[in-house]
Protein backbone atom coordinates (compact mmCIF):
# COMPACT_ATOMS: atom_id res chain seq x y z
CA UNK A 1 0.00 0.00 0.00
CA UNK A 2 2.81 2.41 0.86
CA UNK A 3 4.48 1.71 -2.50
CA UNK A 4 1.25 2.52 -4.34
CA UNK A 5 0.87 5.79 -2.44
CA UNK A 6 4.50 6.72 -3.11
CA UNK A 7 4.09 5.96 -6.81
CA UNK A 8 0.93 8.12 -6.92
CA UNK A 9 2.76 10.96 -5.14
CA UNK A 10 5.76 10.73 -7.49
CA UNK A 11 3.47 10.91 -10.54
CA UNK A 12 1.73 14.00 -9.15
CA UNK A 13 5.04 15.72 -8.42
CA UNK A 14 6.44 14.89 -11.86
CA UNK A 15 3.30 16.22 -13.53
CA UNK A 16 3.50 19.41 -11.44
CA UNK A 17 7.17 19.93 -12.40
CA UNK A 18 6.10 19.84 -16.05
CA UNK A 19 9.28 18.45 -17.59
CA UNK A 20 8.81 17.25 -21.17
CA UNK A 21 10.50 14.59 -23.25
CA UNK A 22 11.86 17.35 -25.52
CA UNK A 23 13.43 19.19 -22.55
CA UNK A 24 15.00 15.96 -21.36
CA UNK A 25 16.38 15.18 -24.84
CA UNK A 26 17.85 18.70 -25.09
CA UNK A 27 19.46 18.40 -21.64
CA UNK A 28 21.10 15.01 -22.13
CA UNK A 29 21.18 14.42 -25.89
CA UNK A 30 24.89 15.21 -26.21
CA UNK A 31 25.93 12.76 -23.46
CA UNK A 32 27.62 9.87 -25.34
CA UNK A 33 26.56 7.22 -22.82
CA UNK A 34 22.90 7.95 -23.52
CA UNK A 35 23.27 6.37 -26.97
CA UNK A 36 23.39 2.96 -25.24
CA UNK A 37 19.78 3.44 -24.14
CA UNK A 38 17.12 3.09 -26.83
CA UNK A 39 13.40 2.41 -26.96
CA UNK A 40 11.75 1.26 -23.74
CA UNK A 41 15.00 1.37 -21.77
CA UNK A 42 15.53 5.02 -22.71
CA UNK A 43 11.93 5.88 -21.77
CA UNK A 44 12.39 4.17 -18.39
CA UNK A 45 15.60 6.14 -17.79
CA UNK A 46 13.81 9.39 -18.65
CA UNK A 47 10.86 8.60 -16.38
CA UNK A 48 13.16 7.55 -13.54
CA UNK A 49 15.09 10.81 -13.97
CA UNK A 50 11.87 12.81 -13.62
CA UNK A 51 10.96 10.82 -10.48
CA UNK A 52 14.47 11.40 -9.10
CA UNK A 53 13.84 15.15 -9.32
CA UNK A 54 10.45 14.69 -7.65
CA UNK A 55 12.21 13.18 -4.61
CA UNK A 56 15.53 15.05 -4.53
CA UNK A 57 16.27 18.76 -4.54
CA UNK A 58 19.19 20.30 -6.41
CA UNK A 59 20.54 23.23 -4.41
CA UNK A 60 23.16 25.80 -5.44
CA UNK A 61 26.54 25.90 -3.75
CA UNK A 62 27.96 29.41 -3.38
CA UNK A 63 24.94 31.03 -5.11
CA UNK A 64 25.51 29.15 -8.39
CA UNK A 65 22.58 29.61 -10.81
CA UNK A 66 21.01 26.24 -11.63
CA UNK A 67 18.76 25.57 -14.63
CA UNK A 68 16.18 22.85 -15.29
CA UNK A 69 18.48 21.42 -17.98
CA UNK A 70 21.27 21.03 -15.42
CA UNK A 71 18.92 19.23 -13.04
CA UNK A 72 17.71 16.91 -15.80
CA UNK A 73 21.28 16.07 -16.83
CA UNK A 74 22.36 15.29 -13.27
CA UNK A 75 19.22 13.25 -12.60
CA UNK A 76 19.71 11.18 -15.75
CA UNK A 77 23.32 10.40 -14.92
CA UNK A 78 22.31 9.59 -11.33
CA UNK A 79 19.68 7.13 -12.51
CA UNK A 80 21.95 5.00 -14.71
CA UNK A 81 23.23 2.88 -11.78
CA UNK A 82 19.70 2.29 -10.44
CA UNK A 83 17.79 1.82 -13.70
CA UNK A 84 17.30 -1.88 -12.94
CA UNK A 85 17.32 -1.48 -9.14
CA UNK A 86 14.72 1.26 -8.68
CA UNK A 87 14.64 4.73 -7.16
CA UNK A 88 14.12 3.42 -3.62
CA UNK A 89 17.82 2.52 -3.59
CA UNK A 90 18.48 6.26 -3.18
CA UNK A 91 16.26 6.57 -0.09
CA UNK A 92 17.71 8.16 3.04
CA UNK A 93 19.07 11.36 1.52
CA UNK A 94 17.40 14.30 -0.20
CA UNK A 95 19.77 16.86 -1.72
CA UNK A 96 22.31 17.35 -4.48
CA UNK A 97 24.44 20.47 -3.94
CA UNK A 98 25.87 21.86 -7.15
CA UNK A 99 28.88 24.16 -7.33
CA UNK A 100 30.03 25.85 -10.53
CA UNK A 101 33.52 24.35 -10.28
CA UNK A 102 35.59 22.23 -7.95
CA UNK A 103 35.15 23.01 -4.26
CA UNK A 104 37.08 22.81 -1.00
CA UNK A 105 35.19 21.32 1.96
CA UNK A 106 35.51 23.32 5.16
CA UNK A 107 36.85 20.59 7.44
CA UNK A 108 40.16 19.10 8.57
CA UNK A 109 41.73 16.46 6.38
CA UNK A 110 44.21 13.75 7.33
CA UNK A 111 46.72 12.34 4.86
CA UNK A 112 47.62 8.65 4.75
CA UNK A 113 50.75 9.35 6.80
CA UNK A 114 48.68 10.96 9.58
CA UNK A 115 49.34 14.65 8.91
CA UNK A 116 46.22 16.74 9.64
CA UNK A 117 45.59 19.78 7.45
CA UNK A 118 43.20 22.64 8.25
CA UNK A 119 41.16 22.09 5.09
CA UNK A 120 40.55 19.35 2.55
CA UNK A 121 41.95 19.22 -0.98
CA UNK A 122 39.95 20.51 -3.93
CA UNK A 123 37.15 18.08 -4.89
CA UNK A 124 34.95 17.52 -7.95
CA UNK A 125 32.40 15.49 -6.02
CA UNK A 126 31.59 14.07 -2.63
CA UNK A 127 28.91 11.83 -1.12
CA UNK A 128 28.04 11.98 2.56
CA UNK A 129 26.58 9.03 4.45
CA UNK A 130 22.88 9.92 5.00
CA UNK A 131 23.67 13.40 3.69
CA UNK A 132 23.90 15.25 0.39
CA UNK A 133 25.78 14.52 -2.78
CA UNK A 134 27.99 17.48 -3.70
CA UNK A 135 29.05 18.01 -7.32
CA UNK A 136 31.06 20.36 -9.50
CA UNK A 137 29.09 21.39 -12.61
CA UNK A 138 32.32 21.68 -14.60
CA UNK A 139 33.09 18.05 -13.73
CA UNK A 140 29.54 16.98 -14.62
CA UNK A 141 30.07 18.49 -18.09
CA UNK A 142 33.34 16.56 -18.49
CA UNK A 143 31.52 13.21 -18.18
CA UNK A 144 32.58 10.94 -21.00
CA UNK A 145 33.45 7.37 -21.74
CA UNK A 146 36.03 7.00 -18.97
CA UNK A 147 34.73 9.03 -16.06
CA UNK A 148 31.55 10.50 -14.65
CA UNK A 149 31.50 12.31 -11.31
CA UNK A 150 27.73 11.87 -10.93
CA UNK A 151 27.78 8.10 -11.42
CA UNK A 152 30.89 7.87 -9.23
CA UNK A 153 29.27 9.70 -6.31
CA UNK A 154 25.96 7.88 -6.72
CA UNK A 155 27.87 4.59 -6.57
CA UNK A 156 29.20 5.74 -3.21
CA UNK A 157 25.61 6.41 -2.07
CA UNK A 158 24.64 2.87 -3.08
CA UNK A 159 27.73 1.49 -1.35
CA UNK A 160 26.87 3.37 1.86
CA UNK A 161 23.47 1.65 2.12
CA UNK A 162 25.13 -1.37 3.72
CA UNK A 163 26.29 0.11 7.04
CA UNK A 164 29.03 2.23 5.52
CA UNK A 165 31.08 2.04 2.37
CA UNK A 166 32.92 -1.19 1.63
CA UNK A 167 33.78 -0.60 -2.03
CA UNK A 168 31.14 -2.99 -3.35
CA UNK A 169 27.92 -1.16 -4.23
CA UNK A 170 24.96 -3.29 -5.32
CA UNK A 171 24.75 -3.56 -9.10
CA UNK A 172 22.08 -5.09 -11.29
CA UNK A 173 23.06 -8.15 -13.36
CA UNK A 174 23.49 -6.14 -16.58
CA UNK A 175 26.18 -3.85 -15.17
Predicted regions located by residue number:
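Amphipathic alpha-helical packing elements
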Residues: 16-53
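Active-site recognition of the HExxH zinc-binding catalytic motif
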Residues: 38, 145-161
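A generic secondary-structure signal for well-formed alpha-helical elements
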Residues: 53-56, 158-162
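Auxiliary, metal-adjacent structural segments of Zn-dependent hydrolase domains
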Residues: 54-144
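Active-site metal-coordination segments of metallo-dependent hydrolases
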Residues: 144-145, 175
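Post-HExxH zinc-binding segment in Zn-dependent metallohydrolases
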Residues: 160-175
Amino acid sequence: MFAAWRNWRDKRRVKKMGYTEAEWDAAVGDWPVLQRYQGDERARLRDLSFRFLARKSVAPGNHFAITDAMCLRIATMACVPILELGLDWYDGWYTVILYEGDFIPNRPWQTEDGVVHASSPVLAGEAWHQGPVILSWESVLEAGQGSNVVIHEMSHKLDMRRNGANGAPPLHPGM
